Design a protein with these regions (language model features):
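Active-site-proximal N-terminal segment of extracellular/periplasmic enzymes that hydrolyze or transfer
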Residues: 14-60
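Second-shell loop/turn segments in exported
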Residues: 18-19, 36-43, 67-68, 111-116, ...
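A long, amphipathic alpha-helix that forms part
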Residues: 40-41, 239-265, 279-320, 395-397, ...
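Short, structured active-site-proximal loop/turn typified by the sulfatase FGly-forming signature C/S-X-P-X-R
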Residues: 42-89, 130, 135-141
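Short secondary-structure boundary/capping segments
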Residues: 45-48, 153-162, 286-294, 329-351
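Metal-dependent active-site segment of extracytoplasmic phospho-/sulfohydrolases and closely related
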Residues: 51, 299-341, 422-424, 444, ...
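His/Asp/Glu-rich, glycine-adjacent segments
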Residues: 86, 91-268, 277-284, 403-410, ...
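Active-site neighborhoods of enzymes that stabilize oxyanions during catalysis
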Residues: 106, 118-126, 132, 139, ...
Length: 532
């Protein structure tokens, strides 16, 4: 009898033990590294020992993240990150039509362009958090105004950016800086870097790149060391050209977290967004294949580890959910591509744009706001149409001219883009990039290797679209994912992890590697401007 009972017990499978409930997140952190390419993780991974190393060892890293829209610039890119939507829906076409707003000057008369999120349409993760918990706090800070403003949409909260010598904001957010930030600005901080030299972090043997490349930095001061101005007035403007700007941004973010009490409420999580802009500056000055870029990323890797460790002393590290991405990628420099025997050039639509402006001014007494950027020729087509301009014929004529430019392989007009098949992947990229309210005439795409005018990104090429997307912390399993993933997934994925839902339709999906039961579904009917 006893033997039979023992056999029965052995044959009975043990009851599964329910997993321990995950502790509620206290803080969601988004790090945005401007112009960060995903291949930097593989190129420099063996030398990463800090924050990037933690992503490689402990996080989910999507190596084919994409800003899958046209006009791959900082403003539209940042507008996608926490909104779950493309620029066609957020209303942010480009940097030029991003956050610049003369109605909201810098607080206290500080240096910098007036700025606000008034062009931004819809909601972001912070609005969704606020809908569930009205006491939710947020801090968004960056060297660039658009990188601080757009991830959190229209929220009138703690949003700050570098205003040449101090951290500031615009009158959209208030009439004065908070006392804690005034005290922080008064510290010596960045002034101690006057006359400092940027030299390589590691011995020369650790760098495969050449140091002396004459087309870098416009042919001036293109070798190490790079010395900062000794005059603090000059340094206040020039420090953005040095890696230290990122460390200053991280330090300010840490102080803001401390002063605002982020992550220390028992009621629910808070949000911290940190935009790190120096990688973009170094990329524009020296290129993505430069020794300077290599060194910048090594330094940022170490600073991110310091930041994470310091933040973990303010907020329990096991209650922080981290994410990292970028606003856009960058192509190899034209000069490098040509040197390697590839096809490359810098086409421009500026001459045809200037001729059109002059013709409109002569004929109608107005240029109708006609401008061009990154292959898009745009303007107030509604006003043109009201004056009798045949928009269709004009667009067709301009498109024929654009097709003759070097490297151009696809050209759309409003009519042809509307009629393009869903299978036309390039058309989908342009549809996602142009806000529904934006008037335009011609959209031209260039082949890989071709860069519009004096820019280094902004096109629809994969190199400009590709960015890393990473999540780590709070038990997220480490893995690397190679399939394409849109940056519009970041906001909905963080929302699902926090246990909240978007308050409006979004096209970004919940990434199953981060939230396995998130339910990656699109709404049945998409409002105008939402393009999957």
């Amino acid at each position: 009898m006893l033997g039979a009972l023992l056999l029965l017990l052995q044959a009975t499978p043990p009851r599964p033990v329910a997993p321990a409930p995950r502790e509620q997140p206290a803080l969601a952190v988004l790090i945005v590294v401007d112009q960060m390419r995903p291949d930097y993780f593989t190129r420099f991974g063996p030398q990463f020992t800090g924050g990037f190393r933690r992503i490689l060892d402990q996080g989910i890293l999507y190596l084919d993240g994409r800003q899958d829209h046209a006009m791959t610039e900082t403003a539209p890119g940042n507008s996608t990150l926490l909104s779950g939507r493309s620029p066609s829906s957020t209303g942010i076409l480009s940097n030029d039509l991003g956050v610049n707003d003369p109605l909201y000057p810098i607080v206290g008369g500080g240096w910098g362009d007036a700025a606000s999120p008034m062009r931004f349409q819809g909601t972001t993760l912070y609005d969704w958090m606020l809908a569930k918990d009205p006491a939710t706090r947020v801090l968004s800070i960056s060297r660039k105004d658009r990188a601080a403003i757009l991830p959190v949409g229209r929220a009138r909260r703690d949003v700050y950016w570098w205003t040449r010598g101090r951290w500031g904001t615009s009158r959209y957010y208030g009439d004065s800086l908070p006392a804690w930030l005034q005290r922080y600005n008064a510290r010596p901080g960045w002034r101690r870097l006057a006359g400092a030299a940027w030299t390589p972090l590691l011995p020369d043997a650790a760098y495969a790149e050449l140091d002396s490349v004459p087309w870098e930095n416009r042919g001036k001061e293109f070798t190490f060391p790079h010395v900062a101005p000794s005059d603090t007035t000059a340094l206040a403007a020039r420090i953005v050209y040095f890696p230290w700007m990122d460390s200053l941004t991280l330090d300010a973010a840490l102080e803001g977290t401390r002063q605002l009490g982020l992550g220390r409420r028992s009621e629910g999580p808070d949000l911290l967004v940190v935009g790190l802009s120096t990688t973009d500056r170094v990329g524009h000055d020296y290129g993505p294949d430069s020794k300077e870029m290599h060194d910048q990323l090594l330094r940022l890797d170490r600073w991110l580890a310091w930041f994470a460790d310091s933040l973990g002393r303010l907020v329990p590290s096991d209650r922080i959910i981290w994410s990292l991405t970028s606003d856009h990628g960058i192509q190899d420099w034209v000069e490098h591509t040509v040197e390697r025997g590839g096809a490359a050039d810098r086409p421009t639509m500026q001459p045809m744009t200037l001729r059109l402006r002059a013709a409109m001014q002569d004929r109608w007494g107005s240029s109708f706001g006609i401008a061009q950027e990154d292959g898009l020729l745009y303007g107030d087509t509604a006003a043109m149409r009201a004056r009798g301009v045949d928009i269709g014929r004009l667009a067709d004529s301009l498109a024929a001219e654009a097709r003759l430019l070097p490297g151009v392989w696809r050209v759309y007009t409003p009519r042809t883009l509307t009629r393009a098949l869903r299978a036309d992947a390039e058309a989908r990229i342009w549809r996602r990039g142009i806000p529904v309210t934006q008037g335009w005439l011609v959209a031209a795409s260039v082949r890989q290797g071709y860069v519009w005018e004096r820019t280094d990104h902004g096109s629809t090429t994969l190199a400009d679209q590709r960015v890393p997307i990473a999540f780590w912390g709070m038990g997220i399993p480490a893995s690397r994912v190679s399939r394409p993933v849109s940056t519009t997934a970041i906001g909905p994925t963080l929302a699902a992890f926090l246990g909240i839902h978007p308050t409006e339709p979004v096209t970004g999906i919940v990434l199953p590697e981060v939230v396995p039961s998130g339910g990656a579904r699109l709404p049945r009917r998409l409002p105008p401007g939402l393009h999957p």
